[in-house]
A protein has these predicted regions:
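Beta/alpha (TIM)-barrel catalytic core signal, keyed to glycine-rich beta->alpha loops juxtaposed to Asp/Glu
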Residues: 1-130
Length: 130
């Protein structure tokens, strides 16, 4: 969970073994990561291991955002969780490690892959959660 400055410092001393991944909180409501960290990670080929990829606290899930999520859910015939996970992996060098507390949830999480949100759907979600 490094900031860009911390990651740069670590990279300066880790010349023999480059940093290849970093686990960070990353979900639909991660504008700081989108603006600051993601571009740096992509430029330096560092994989983001998205922790908390299903976490969207209710205070951030406004009626407008919920409506947009429901629209994308209907368009894709997927659940909100699947849409949220797929949105994360629509970014270059991002993988997810979603929490699961049941077999049903694990199966749902697994089916978040093998398909893609359209570029228009990704943009719609980006704009809604910016």
């Amino acid at each position: 969970n490094f900031s860009v400055n911390e990651l740069q410092e670590a990279q300066e001393v880790m010349t023999k073994h480059p940093i290849v991944s970093n686990q960070v909180l990353y979900n639909l409501n991660s504008p700081r990561l989108e603006q600051d960290l993601l571009p740096y990670y992509q430029e330096h080929h560092i994989t983001i291991i998205a922790d908390g990829s299903l976490a969207t606290p209710s205070r951030f899930l406004t009626d407008r955002r919920l409506k947009i999520l429901e629209q994308v859910e209907a368009q894709t015939n997927r659940t909100m969780a699947q849409v949220a996970l797929n949105w994360c992996t629509s970014r270059t060098n991002v993988i997810v490690i979603p929490k699961s507390n049941s077999v049903t949830r694990t199966e749902e999480n697994c089916t978040a892959s093998g398909w893609r949100l359209s570029p228009a759907q990704v943009r719609t979600l980006d704009e809604a959660f910016a």
